């Protein structure tokens, strides 16, 4: 008797590039916006920009989830040296916890293309662990993508049912960029709990979780950050402290409820606002 190979159980952790997670990449609102780029300057003389492909928009909340799921699969596959991932769109959407239908298939195809074509510009902001230096130049999130809308064995059958072609999911092959893989393999990474990440329904909470893990990897159990800097680093479009607090409060409550934060306080000192985070223990955050 020939036994079918056992499927590898889904990875409970997700490895992500710590250098990239310290920088803003994804808009946290999918509402209409005139933003043509994301710009972040952590210090004088250093600048980070995210530029969409001509005619497209900046990566948003769905793209954020797609990108994290790609790295979930990279972790699950044992960090393949070539960075190549192969999957059906159907299985990918199911793993993301998304509805599977013709609309979401097209949404996923569009998102993968957007991630591939979005340009990242680093002026001494992106840290390259292999050279222990900050990079100058352009980067991409994905090196290559290809999507075969029909499995070869099914092509002749699908020709008999043309109405199914538009919604047929297809098989994707995606290559993660080498610079991010190099950092992760070198240990310059953050580690998320996949089950806990999936319970966070707020895009802001998901982004905050990743940013707080950057602070943890840099040796912080408590992290104080200026509210204005936090807004730029996430990024958030709101600028007034009262507006930012309204956006952050539900995310903070969600992170505390999930056991990822022990406490968070917003404090005003002179004319500036700060956020003080107390992180939960590592054993709870990777459960």
For the regions a language model picked out, list residue spans one by one.
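Charged, alpha-helix-forming regions
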Residues: 1-287
């Amino acid at each position: 008797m020939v036994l079918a190979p056992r499927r590898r159980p889904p990875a409970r952790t997700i490895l992500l590039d710590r250098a990239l997670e310290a920088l803003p990449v994804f808009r946290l609102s999918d509402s209409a916006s005139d933003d043509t780029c994301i710009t972040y300057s952590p210090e004088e003389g250093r600048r980070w920009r995210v530029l969409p492909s001509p005619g497209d928009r900046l990566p948003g909340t769905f793209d954020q989830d797609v990108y994290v799921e790609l790295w979930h699969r990279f972790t699950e596959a044992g960090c393949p040296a070539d960075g190549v991932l192969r999957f059906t769109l159907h299985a990918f959407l199911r793993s993301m916890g998304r509805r599977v239908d013709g609309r979401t298939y097209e949404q996923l195809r569009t998102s993968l293309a957007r991630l591939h074509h979005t340009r990242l510009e680093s002026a001494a902001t992106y840290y390259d662990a292999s050279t222990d230096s900050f990079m100058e130049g352009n980067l991409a999130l994905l090196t290559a993508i290809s999507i075969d809308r029909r499995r070869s064995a099914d092509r002749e059958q699908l020709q008999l049912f043309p109405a199914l072609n538009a919604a047929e999911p297809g098989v994707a092959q995606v290559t993660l960029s080498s610079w991010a893989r190099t950092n992760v393999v070198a240990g310059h990474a953050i580690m998320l709990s996949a089950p806990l990440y999936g319970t966070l329904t707020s895009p802001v909470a998901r982004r905050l979780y990743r940013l707080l893990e950057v602070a943890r990897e840099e040796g912080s159990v408590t992290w104080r950050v200026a509210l204005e800097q936090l807004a730029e680093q996430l990024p958030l479009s709101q600028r007034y402290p009262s507006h930012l607090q309204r956006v952050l409060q539900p995310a903070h409550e969600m992170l505390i409820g999930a056991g990822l934060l022990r406490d968070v306080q917003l404090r005003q000192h002179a004319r500036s606002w700060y956020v003080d985070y107390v992180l939960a223990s590592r054993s709870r955050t990777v459960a």
